[in-house]
């Protein structure tokens, strides 16, 4: 898909499809008003006749509009003018995509980016439009022998901005929007890939692929023998029951003006399949446990977006690849594991494996002397119960870092909600036989999981994103969401801007 921006007059657009907005009730946007004057009241006559009310998402396709050089004019309902939110704006853009896709038009000139969205600028309108278009056009058919038949997709979208002075911001939005939507698509592709293909070795090959593609990326892959030498016993215990060995992939992106600048480290839980191990999960929906590597997928997608944006930062992405399977050699409830930092952990449930993989990974990344560390993981069903499928759960030992992430989440419309940490939750992790238990009971399960991880992050500023509710969708819309690539990308953009 080719995207571009310009500042032009609506009446001069010679294109396959010209898109303008109509507010509720039957109120023309500025661009639609200009077309109405050019067509001598043709559009307003249709509205008075009741052909379009202007409710958000309604569409009306017009052909041969008098005096208008465009082949087609698509009117898109935008709801009430003063109540247009980011969510509604994206839905409007996606309705545009659906309508245009049915016409066979190859090019679209879109004036919806001139709409007033609450608290947003031309930059955000253009960037959100690109992300919404790519989201709408995304499909994953790699393993279908008969590909679904689709009409020719349009290949070019030209966004119009109302003021020439906004063109520079709009061009920047193009760059960021394309990079972030590419990163989201990469994350989705990896997460949607079946677990008999996407195993820890597959994740490692993807990480190597980034190094082959970008000169400022270097990838190191650590195998189980190296992990054993490092004392990553908790990580390895989870992997013991699987025929597929674990791999820890370290993707180093260096583009900071100061090559010695401390890196930002992103850690992703990469359980390419989680059966629960000996504490086996119910069979219902177990197929969705291929998504237990959503954290690693989002780190991979973010590193792709970062490389495309060429941000002047040093960033390290870590994919903690592993598989949790039942087997005669699998770890058991009652086992006591010695972690890489020396703390011992009593295993009370083998399905609380992500924190065991992450605790050793969080210790491992100390060697990079990071500016900060953010881990993301499909860690707990408890977070889904608490926050549903709309907000990722955020926990942090740093108020500054937490606020930066919450700000980025709001900016990117990739929402997160902060949950507490504290000594009272540490009490729930006490064990009679080890330093820690790997679960803290039913109450506050998402928080006690984050509290567990905090024991391994004492040497740097740290935040944890529990994406169990946001990394994928179930039911008829089953599939990966690519979250929180947008949030993380915005966080990195902000870091680059504030240096």
Swiss-Prot record:
Its EC number is 3.4.11.1, 3.4.11.10. Its main location: cytoplasm. Transmembrane segments: none annotated. Disulfide bonds: none annotated. Binds 2 manganese ions per subunit. The active site is at residues 281, 355. Keywords: Aminopeptidase, Cytoplasm, Hydrolase, Manganese, Metal-binding, Protease. InterPro entries: Leucine_aapep/pepB, Macro_dom-like, Peptidase_M17_C, Peptidase_M17_leu_NH2_pept, Peptidase_M17_N. Belongs to the peptidase M17 family. This is Probable cytosol aminopeptidase. It comes from Actinobacillus pleuropneumoniae serotype 5b (strain L20). The gene is pepA.
